[in-house]
C-alpha cells in the first residue's frame, strides 16, 4: 500500500526553477512537470548568466501557454532548481541547509 501511495505522490510533484533578482525581495519562478524539462530550463538560465547573452530571457508557463515572463539577464543574481511535492504540503527547502 505504501508503494502505491508513493507512486501516486511522485506524480504530484513539480520542479521549480527560481530566479533571484537584484534588489527584489521576491523571486521569479517557473515550474515544470518533468525533471528533464526543469534541468533544461536551469541550464538555459546558467548559460545566459555565463555568457551575458541574450540580454533578455523569456520563460513560459508549462500549464498556461500564454503566460510568459521576460527578465533582464544582467539582473539575475542566482538560479536554483528544487522539487515541490504535494505530499509535504509545500516544497523541499530551497537553497542549502545544514539541517538533516
UniProtKB/Swiss-Prot annotation:
InterPro entries: UPF0367. HAMAP family: UPF0367 (MF_01360). Belongs to the UPF0367 family. This is UPF0367 protein PMT_1986.
Amino acid at each position: 500500500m505504501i508503494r502505491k501511495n508513493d507512486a501516486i505522490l511522485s506524480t504530484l510533484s513539480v520542479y521549480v526553477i527560481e530566479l533571484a533578482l537584484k534588489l527584489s525581495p521576491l523571486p521569479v519562478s517557473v515550474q515544470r512537470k518533468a525533471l528533464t524539462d526543469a534541468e533544461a530550463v536551469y541550464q538555459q538560465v546558467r548559460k545566459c548568466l555565463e555568457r551575458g547573452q541574450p540580454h533578455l530571457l523569456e520563460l513560459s508557463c508549462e500549464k498556461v501557454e500564454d503566460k510568459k515572463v521576460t527578465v533582464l539577464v544582467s539582473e539575475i543574481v542566482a538560479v536554483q532548481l528544487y522539487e515541490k511535492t504535494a505530499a509535504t504540503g509545500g516544497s523541499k527547502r530551497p537553497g542549502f541547509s545544514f539541517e538533516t
